[in-house]
Amino acid sequence: MSTALIIVDVQNDFCEGGLVAVAGGAAVAEQISEYLRVCDYAAITATRDYHIDPRAHFSDNPNFVDTWPPHCWADTPGADFHPNLDTAPIDEVFFKGAYSAAYSGFQGATKDGTALADWLRTKGIDTVDVCGIATDHCVRATALDARTAGFDTRVLLSLSAGVSPASIDRALDELREAGVEIAGNIES
């Protein structure tokens, strides 16, 4: 069994002070960095929301389900990884959402166009741990797509931050129903 870590959207615009801030995002960035000092994965990847023209994904009157305030514009500080996240151990970054809404890291690709699932398979990965921001949106979508792609999947809940308790609970129920393991802490 070969396992990879997928760090989802730990970016400035999703942390405190950002355009679509999630409470606890900066702390999660630091906790992931601490975890990276002691974990042992065959590969470590990260995703980045990276919008050029996402069309209807952005709205001046967002519903926070299908539409959102503008965020993570390509080549802006908001799209950068949060400074609390140690990016040195990351083997590859997958960019998503350039021209449409993209919640899952599996909708992203490297700068040379390699899709996440393909990249993981070339590394012999069969299991993934997923963490990051937001538990109830992009972490959820990435974990569900990992299962759909055939990877054994676990969400590291203590290394993730979500938008609201109610939507986190709904997301966790959906993940469990899909066969995703929920690890309450990194020792799980």
Give the location of each predicted region.
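A generic secondary-structure signal
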Residues: 34-38, 118-122, 145
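Histidine-anchored nucleotide/phosphate-binding helix
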Residues: 35, 137-148
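Surface-exposed beta-strand edges and their flanking turn/coil or helix-capping segments
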Residues: 59, 106-109, 143, 168-169
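Short active-site-adjacent structural elements
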Residues: 103, 137-141, 162-165
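Glycine-rich anion-binding loop/nest that anchors nucleotide
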Residues: 125-138, 155-160
